[in-house]
Structures are given as C-alpha cells and as structure tokens.
C-alpha cells in the first residue's frame, strides 16, 4: 500500500487510518458491513498530501513554529494557520497526483457529481472525533473543480478552528496528515444524523434521529431545525416535528442552493415511524461492528438509506465492562475520595488490587456496584440515608434511578440491614483507646513493609507485593478500624440531628470537633506553620527560597546561613507527610517528597501572613472554642424538659465525637503511606527497565496495569503501541466529567438539589462547615498555581489532604465535589472555615477575584460582584 496516491473506498478498511485519514478509513470499513450502503468513491491518500507539503515553500518552518506556539496565544495561532493555508492552497498539484485523481474519476464517472471531503489522520478517532474541523464540499462537478477542491481540503487542515482543537487535544500538528475522500453524490429527499445512544443522558438503549429535508449540511451547520425522533426497543417513543422553513439542495451543474420549503410541507414529518425504526436498526448493526455508540450521518433517496459517515460518540462517559445483562447501578469512587480526575492504568489496577470491595473501571475512573444494596429494602434505606447525609447529589441521582422504574427492587424482606443512621437512637459508646491501638498497629505494619520490601527486586518484588496487598486489605478492613470511623460519624450525625431538633442549633458538631486529637491531616497543615517559624528566623533562607525554581533546592539550602536548620525542618516534615500529593489515590501521581518545591510558596506565604507560634495558638484557640460550645450546649439542654437526660446523652456523644472525629483522617494517611512504599519499589523496577533499554521513560509504566508491569519485568519487553494507545485514551478521559451515579445502560447522573431555601441567583451546595464569610474568590484548578492571601475564599473542583496547608490562611472553601465527611469538609471544620461543597460548576460560575459570600451553615454561595 505504501506510496499509493489514490485508493478506492472498497479497498480501504479501519487499518487504513494513516493512509487515508479517519473519515476515509471509517467509510471504507462501513462499506464492508453487510446491508450498509455507502456511496462509492476513492481517497486521495496522505502520500499525496506529503508530496504537497514537501513542495510547499515555508511549510516545514511554519509547522515547527505552530507546534511551539502557546495555544493561548490566539493571535499567533491565527496568523500561522492563515499563512499555512495560503502556502498549501497556492502550491500546484504535482502532475502524478493530478493524473492519479483524473484516472480515478474516469473509473467512477468523470461527469458525475461528487462530495469532496477532508479526512485527517487525527479525525473520527475512538477518543476524539475532531468533527467539523476541516472542510467538506458538496456537488462538485468536473475534473478541474474536483482537483481544486482537493487542494482546498488539504489547506483546511490549517483552519484556525482545526489548529486550536488539535492544540487543546495535545496533538502535534507535525504528526497530522490529510487524506481526501471523493465520493459519488447522493441527491437525497431527506438526510440527518443518528445517535445510537442518547447524547444527553448517555442511555445506550435509546437512539436519537435528527431529520431534515434535502442535504444534511443544512442540519449539521445549524441552518435548519430538524425533526427529532427517539427510538427505544424498536419503537418510536417520542417525536418533535419542527417547522422546517428552508432546505439545502444540489444545483444542476454543481454547487448547492438554499431554498424555501412550501408552507404546507413545513410541518410534515421527514420520516415515518417505520423508516426511523429501520434506520436505527441499521445504526445498531454499525454500532455492533465498531463496538461503540456511533454518531452517523445518513441520507435517504428512492433507493433507501445511505450512510455517509459514522464516528464514535466521544462525549459519552464509558460504561464498565460486564459479563451479564443485569441492570446495574454504579457509584463513583472518586466523588467519595475527593479526586475525580482520570487515573492512569497502573493506579487503577493497584487501587482495585488493594480495595476491600470489587471495583469497576470506566473512563479512567473507579466505581462500586451498588445494585445488591439497592435491591433489598433495608439496605437500600441505609444506603440512601448514609449517602444522603454525606452527599445529597448522589442520593438524588440514586433516587432518580429508582423513580425511573429502570431498577426492579426485590420484594420487602428481612435483610439484616442496619437501621438508617438518622433513626434517633443514641449510638453505642466506643472505647477511645482503640484509636491509639489502631494507629500503633498501622505503624508496625508499615515499618515491617518498609523493612522487607528493600530486599526484593524483579519478579520476586511483584510476588511480595501481592502478599503485601493482602496485608493492606487486612489493615484497612480491620473491624476495629471500621468501628472507630463509624463511632465518629455516628456521633456527629446524632449531635447535629438532636441539637438542631432540641436547640435549633445547626451543625453544632462543626465547633465541637475543633482541635480534636489525632487528626493527621489538620496536623499536616499546622506543622507547615512550624516549618515557617524556622525559616522566618533566617532572612538569608527566606531570600534563597524566594528564588527556588526546581526540586533540588534542599541540597543547596545548607550553603545559606541558617539553611541547615531550615533543611532539617523541611526534611522532618517530608518524613512525615512526603507521601502525600494531589490525587493521591492514584499511585502514579508524584508525591511531595519528589516535588518538595511545591511547599516553598506555601511556607513563604506563612512567613508573611503569620507570627511565630501560630500553629500552637490556632490549635489551642480551637480547643477553647470547642470546650466553650460544649458548656453552652449542655447548659441550654439542662433548661429543657427532661434536660438532665438530654444533657447526659449529649455529653457522652461529645466525648465520643472528640475521641474519634480526628481518626477519620488516619486510614487514608495509612493507605497513602503504604502506597508510597509500593511506588518507590516499583519506580526502581521502572528505572531498571530504562537502563536495559526496555523503556524510553520510567513513567511509561504508569500506562501498564500491575499485571502488565510484572510481565514486562519478567520478559524484558513492553508493547510500545499499547502504551501510546493508553496515553491517548488517558488524554480523552481527562476531558470527561465523571457522573456520581452510572448505570449499566450508560445513563450518567450527577443529581440535583431539591431546595426552596436558596436565594435567587445563589449557588446551592452542601453545608459542611458552619459560619458565614465574605471575601475574594480565588478559583484554583491546580494547587501548584495557587496564589492565595489571608482572607481569600478558595474555589476549586475538589480537595484532598494534600491541599491542607493551603487551608491555614484562607477564610472559606467552595468545591464542586465533596460530602459531609470527605477530607476537605473535615479539615474545613477543623480550621473553622465556612465551607460549602458539592456546588455544581462552581469553578465556571464563580469568577476569579469576584467577591462572594459563603453561607457554610445554610449551604449556599451569594455572588456579590
């Protein structure tokens, strides 16, 4: 195939992407499906495009410059793209290319009308459609016109929209080439688009048909409103008939013309129900062939339906793979862990290997199957209650699934499920000494892991790790560990419910848990204030840190007066917290021990914003406030009827919540501490593969599963194509927003607030830390780029424990993801910040620098400017 300038569509299949581009490869593959009619034609190959680019003056230099330009510099992008279009469009077609196209036209009918369609190699891919980025020309007649439009298609690879889109997708412009499809025109009476899955809800069982009169380009370009038909299980279940006032038609001799539609026909259905069902059946055949939901362009003439394009619907959130047809309901793990970014394959596989429950993978995220718990009334009520307290949006999404009738619960039966957490009963008291015991057990287990793993390498390391994962699960799943976590949560729920009922006091536990002991995440933030105390006593150290640009600064720091003491303070901090990082549930994310420069701006901010001893003062202030709140609450309770009994119950629960609330953060710390040890050992193996020439980059192992990594170490070989595919898939997954709830049929649900107490124009969320604060919003998407001042309100997508040092100086917190007991909420309460989480699209609806008011008790945000 190498070097061909023209190839007939019938000789192309999906493997021809590099030769004919995405559209051409898909059309060739479509033409091979039984019962699918694709207009005949040929492709001008990417070899012809390369010939043009080789002969086009300046093209190489312009492409190099375009690939280096910052995608945010739109003026530079616009200028370079325009120059490339001009250069390519002005380059004459080589004689061999013109002869090849002319010969193909002679075979297919040189007097016929054709569609001339761009087909880039970065187009209609499984992970990115690139739809509409290059040009298509309809009803082109005559050899000279077709040659001219082939040249125009080549130039359209460099339209500003195409260049911008590729830049955002991380595609190097120098690696993309253009094929051109030249295809016999179908002159249709109707045309449109078929989505074999609902593009809004994601439901794979529901197909949507958009249909209009005449050529489909009018519909694709938004010139006309289409009829919309919804087809499910072989029948039309909904239809909207639009007023179709205009249509696009082919003109005799070439070109197209927009024409008005007679008034009497404007409300006529474009398709009958039978035709819509027939079209969807055709779409299902195409979907089955390609193995994923498709966005299909179709047209209808007297001979029936013709398919002129099919591409993956890349905006749908993927569905976990399964081996049965049972309707299933999945809950997002990332929303519970406050990390909704896509994870790499190594991180996904290791989380699954160490998880207590089966995990299911989709879109680079993890989900748990909640079907069994929803099936039985008792466990269903408990799940909805517990989930609802932590994250009302997830509860609403689950209730939507139940209300839609998709899920068929089992009849009422005794299932041994616990009563809902809010049933009013006082929780059993737990022995506070178990916290000390659990922490000591965890430390001993970690020390043993560190001692033993150092002696392992090669295949023996992976065998050892599999045993370590079992110990990992034993530590995390220890019933005593679960009891300690639940003791704090149950006491929190009881106090909040009863004190609001008895005293009208909302979220009283927020204050009662201030400066609770054993909260390793709040200690992480406060201890960085202690590092700042060391740094501030040495002006030369401060000056040195202000110039830090890389992660090697700790080696240079002792050369500065006072630097040795400062280095020791940093090292002590890293010894305890260096395993933490943004997105720490993914073992491939670099911990702060490997990126210590991330601490420098936070330490310098603390030096400027706080005086010496701030950590101890803040902790003691929190403890005093908690004790004062306890005295106040108990005194008010004693004044009520049956007050002594109520006060005694509250005292017991306050004692319990203070004993156990801090421990809520420890299990995650223990998990990440173990994962850091795993990571160090695995990276040593990756480095060995690099030294052996098996890998080009140690981080390529991030795109292998644990099993694949083990195999690579054993056989000393890695499939580079697999790694490239995984990198492409990861980039596409990063662009997807994961739902809180996902069904096995692809319905993605994020939930909604059902409230009438939110002022008009305010943003609703979940109240997780009491108080009201007004200040400047700082919208931060990357912790490393945070520029916060005292009194600012942090607005971000999510926070995990690694963000804790930033909480020390801010006044409030707003996140898009989170729940009552997730880490950001716990630490916001610990630091006394007004906080609202679960605010949908907060980082887009709140402007950086905008003044806002956070109502942490009521759960909403007012936009003030």
Swiss-Prot record:
Chain intervals for the UniProt region annotation (Rifampicin-binding): 327-752
Composition bias type Low complexity, residue spans: 409-424
E.C. code: 2.7.9.6
Reactions mediated catalytically: rifampicin + ATP + H2O = 21-phosphorifampicin + AMP + phosphate + 2 H(+)
Catalytic center residues: 823 (tele-phosphohistidine intermediate)
Ranges for region Swivel phosphohistidine: 765-863
InterPro entries assigned to the protein according to its UniProt record, in alphabetical order: ATP_grasp_subdomain_1, PEP-util_enz_mobile_dom, PEP_Utilizing_Enz, Phosphohistidine_dom_sf, PPDK_AMP/ATP-bd
Induction line: Up-regulated in the presence of RIF.
Residues at which ATP binds: 23, 117, 132, 136, 183, 297, 309, 311
Region (ATP-binding): 2-314
Phenotype caused by lack of the gene: Disruption mutant fails to inactivate RIF. Mutant displays a modest twofold decrease in RIF minimum inhibitory concentrations (MICs) compared with the wild-type strain.
Keyword RNA-binding attached: no
Highest taxon of source: Bacteria
Keywords assigned: Antibiotic resistance, ATP-binding, Kinase, Nucleotide-binding, Transferase
Biological process per Gene Ontology, one example term: response to antibiotic
Location of the region described as Disordered in the Swiss-Prot/TrEMBL record: 403-430
Molecular-function annotations in GO: ATP binding; kinase activity
Family matches, as NCBIfam families: PRK06241.1-2, PRK06241.1-4, RIF_Ptrans_rph, RPH_KJ151292.1
Record remark: domains: Contains three domains: an N-terminal ATP-binding domain, a large central rifampicin (RIF)-binding domain and a small C-terminal swivel phosphohistidine domain that harbors the conserved histidine residue essential for phosphate transfer.
Family the entry assigns: Belongs to the rifampicin phosphotransferase family.
UniProt protein name: Rifampicin phosphotransferase
Organism: Streptomyces sp
Lineage, top ranks: Bacteria, Bacillati, Actinomycetota, Actinomycetes, Kitasatosporales
